[in-house]
Amino acid sequence: MRAISVLAVVVLALLLIPFPSAAEDPKPPSDDLSLTLGGRVWATTATSSRQVSAPGFARLSDLRWRGVDALVPEVNFELVWRRLVGLMTLGGGIIKDGVLIDEDFSSSGLRTSATRSDVDDSHTFHVSLDVGARVFDWAAQQATSRGYIDVLAGFQYWQERYVAFGGTGFPTAVGGDARAISNDYRWRSVRIGARTQVPVYRGLSVSLRGYLIPWSSLVIDDVHYLRDDLRRDPSFRDEANGGIGGQVDAAARYAITDHLAVELGFQYWMIKSAEGDETAFGTAGTVRQTLKEAKTERYGPFVGVRWRF
């Protein structure tokens, strides 16, 4: 909850930033229509986890995916017409690093198995669409970029697919070439937030954007390839509605020309699910269990370029 509180403060601060009255310009920019095409390369690391319980088992199974790194290219579109703002982002990358820690427990809470597997042949993907309004904009002396504050609301689809190979630990070990487990996390989220650009000097400016995620829907498909007592289409399915999260990014930008700008910054995403349901698809039938919680974080620095038409 500490991360959620920090993100809430960021969004509130974006809406309350005071600016000197001398710099205010209540009129819209001279261009009624502005289109900006941008590209980023986001160097990320991530973690995902889920905890499952069942009747008589306060803690049945924990799966933790750690260090699932990816270099994520992003393409983003920004359309501003008078005071209306539209944003779209599309990105994804290949994951070829990381580990899976898989633990199972008895009804008394004792750990009955623990394995560690390597991650490969995985990927991350996201697409988002936001609309909003430019509530304030201004011109600053000795700066070529305008400042602004936008309020935003939108939707994001975020997928993390992981595949674990082999396994070391107890009660058994598996060869490293054998596909052991795959998890496919699919987050669908509503988000609200704000962003600002603050001119500093000449072409230099600072941008900050923050979103709160008040609601999300999560589906996780889990396949256990080495268990003969489970189906593989999938072996388990987790579903939860009502999660919470937040996303924030900050960057320093420099406008090389009136059209071309570069940026360097950092981006952090996190979503945590509400309690949900898990269905285990056995070869002899299905069993209902409880998804206690699932969580995904992805974060890291980025570099980008922007072209304003």
Locations of the language-model features?
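Transmembrane beta-barrel strands of outer-membrane/channel proteins
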Residues: 35-43, 79, 88-94, 133, ...
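Short loop/turn motifs that connect adjacent beta-strands in outer-membrane beta-barrel proteins
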Residues: 24-33, 78-85, 136-149, 200-206, ...
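Extended, basic/helix-rich recognition subdomains
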Residues: 253, 261-263, 273
